[in-house]
Each structure stands twice: as C-alpha cells, then as structure tokens.
Regions:
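A short acidic, often aromatic-flanked loop/helix-cap motif at beta-alpha or helix-coil junctions
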Residues: 75-78, 149-151, 199
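Short, low-complexity, polar/charged sequence segments that are solvent-exposed and flexible
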Residues: 34-35, 67-69, 88-89, 133-134, ...
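Activity-critical C-terminal alpha-helical subdomain
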Residues: 174-201
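Non-catalytic alpha-helical coupling and interface elements of nucleotide-dependent molecular machines
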Residues: 41, 73, 129-133, 188
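Switch/communication elements of ASCE P-loop NTPase nucleotide-binding domains
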Residues: 1-105, 121-122
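Conserved helicase/translocase motor-coupling segment
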Residues: 109-184
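Noncatalytic linker/hinge segments flanking ATPase motor cores
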Residues: 13-15, 45, 55-62, 88-94, ...
C-alpha cells in the first residue's frame, strides 16, 4: 500500500524501491509493475527498482532493454546502449513481444543453457539429479526454446545482456538450419546424437 501511495503522490518525483515483489504473489507483482509504469508516464516520475523477480521483467520493445542494469559480483554493471545495432533486429523485436516468463528467469542467471524442448529438459533434469549437479546454485538457467530456429535470436538477446550462453541441440540443428552455425564461434555447443554425447568448444 505504501508503494502505491508513493506512486500516485504527485509531490514524489523519484522513487527507489528495493525488491517490490516481497510478499506478493505473481499476479500482484504483475499488477504492481503495471501501476509503476503507469505512474511513471502519467506523473513523469523516475522509478528505479532492484528486483530478483522474473515477474518484474516486461518488454514491449527492444529499446526497453536499455532500461535494465545487470549486476554481477565479479564484473562491472552491464547496461545496453540505445545505439546498439542489435536493437534494430526485426527478429529480436518480434521475439520480445512474445517472450514468456521462462526467458525472463534467464535475466537473473550468470549462464544460460538453451535447449530444444521438453525431451531435452527431461535429459537435463536426469543428468543433474544423477550427477548431483546444482546448476541453480551455480547461477545457471536451463531454457527450452520454441524450436531450434529460435536459437540465434535468443542467443543474441542473452549475449546483449552479458550472459554466457550454452546450446544443447541435435545434429539436425546444423543440417536443417544454417543460421544456427554462427553460435559455435563464441559459445559452447553441446551436440546430441543417438549414440554419444559430444561436447564441442
């Protein structure tokens, strides 16, 4: 209530809010985010929030990526310049309009593994449990994409915001879509075939 009161107080010009999502369920977090955006526009307020909630990530355009500042313990804060050429990518703009919550969770990770779908997620969960790998504690996020054709644009997005990207794909990902091949240059690509698991760097 105190946050909402400050949002609509015309005397308050600048708000610094630490973790506004505390004690709020996801639906109320979404509501609060909408109210913050509305108040910022209506009353010309400057609102800065610190958050660990994926519900607080909402992008309607590529230029809104410039409003985010990403912090890591071992590096300088990362913020995208409005002049960044990648922001003009049509595919990136289209993806951001339909970006779901699972991708937003990757904004808080140090490393992101992109996988093709549910079968790969089952494999990853099995290996993590079998090998006792605590990827979440290590700051890693596994994200299933909507088909291998989405790998390039999603990789581009996470590179822009300073994330390390790893891709898990079948061999047909390279024979069916040549656009995927560019990922190899700067990322780890894990290729799965029916016989072995091969890791290429």
């Amino acid at each position: 209530i105190s946050i909402l009161a400050a949002l609509f107080d015309e005397v308050v010009e600048v708000l610094l809010i630490d973790e506004p999502e505390v004690s709020l369920h996801p639906q109320l977090q979404s509501y609060l985010l909408r109210e913050m955006k509305s108040a910022a526009k209506r009353y010309n307020k400057t609102i800065i929030i610190s958050t660990h909630s994926a519900e607080m990530i909402e992008l309607n355009s590529a230029s809104e990526l410039c409003n985010f500042v990403f912090f890591r313990k071992d590096s300088l804060p990362k913020q995208i310049s409005p002049d960044t050429p990648e922001l003009n990518s049509v595919k990136l703009k289209e993806f951001l309009l339909r970006m779901s919550l699972i991708y937003s969770e990757g904004f808080f990770a140090k490393k992101v593994m992109l996988i093709e779908g549910s079968s790969d997620m089952i494999l990853c969960r099995y290996l993590c449990n079998r090998l006792n790998l605590k990827l979440d504690v290590a700051g890693s996020q596994i994200i299933p994409v909507e088909g291998k054709g989405q790998f390039p644009v999603i990789t581009k997005l996470f590179r822009l915001i300073g994330k390390e990207v790893c891709v898990l794909t079948d061999l047909d990902g390279f024979t069916d879509d040549n656009n995927i091949k560019f990922i190899i240059n700067n990322n780890t690509v894990i290729i799965i075939n029916p016989i072995t698991i091969k890791i290429e760097y």
